[in-house]
């Protein structure tokens, strides 16, 4: 049979939370029809801002069923679909960074801004046991768009931050801020510098590092780091 691995699959929940993952598509070699690669790419990209389900799990289930139904009808054969999120393959270039979705319940948050909204960044009182501690978090919810082609660019963002007194980062607000780049059109380096600058201005940290590891495109992956 034929197996397709789609690495840029995403939709959003009814609360606006992006869900991202790799979609595996399989159909029999007996099929009399074949799918054209550019058309399936455009088809899958059409879900990027489509709301599906109240939670990430519901969104994935609905998206899988929708793709299976649509492709089975188009190819006139049975199509099997699986979706794998980053939870299944936590292999990252940076060690010791906590996944943001394991620190807070993203399903409970509302996401409404998708145009790099630095006003999303909020502070909370520093917990006594965290005074002077370095915060190291990562998220796979970074999506921006190429300023030339407007094609979506997908990445993981890693943040190392040592807070100053009175400026402990609110993790829920950081999640909202990362998601707010979803409809921004800039180069990878510009996005990384924007994130770094906004975090520096919002929290006045003693230490700060931002790395944006973007998915490979055209044989190249760009990984800007600012510190």
Regions found by a protein language model. Give the residues of each.
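N-terminal intrinsically disordered, cationic/polar leader segments
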Residues: 1-227
């Amino acid at each position: 049979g034929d197996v397709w691995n789609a690495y840029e699959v995403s939709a959003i929940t009814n609360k606006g939370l992006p869900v991202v993952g790799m979609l595996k598509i399989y159909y029999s070699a007996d099929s009399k029809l074949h799918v054209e690669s550019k058309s399936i790419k455009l088809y899958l990209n059409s879900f990027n801002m489509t709301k599906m389900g109240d939670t990430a799990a519901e969104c994935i289930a609905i998206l899988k069923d929708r793709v299976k139904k649509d492709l089975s009808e188009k190819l006139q054969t049975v199509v099997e679909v699986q979706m794998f999120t980053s939870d299944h393959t936590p292999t990252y270039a940076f060690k010791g960074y906590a996944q943001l979705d394991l620190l807070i319940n993203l399903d409970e948050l509302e996401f409404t801004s998708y145009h790099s909204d630095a006003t999303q960044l909020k502070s909370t009182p520093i917990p006594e046991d965290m005074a002077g501690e370095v915060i190291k978090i990562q998220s796979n919810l970074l999506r921006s768009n190429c300023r030339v082609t407007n094609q979506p660019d997908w990445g993981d963002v890693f943040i190392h931050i040592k807070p100053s007194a009175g400026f402990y980062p609110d993790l829920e607000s950081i999640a909202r801020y990362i998601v707010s780049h979803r409809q921004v059109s800039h180069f990878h380096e510009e996005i990384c510098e924007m994130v770094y600058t906004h975090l520096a201005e919002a929290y006045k940290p003693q230490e700060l590092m931002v790395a944006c590891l973007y998915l490979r495109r055209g044989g190249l992956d760009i990984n800007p780091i600012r510190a």
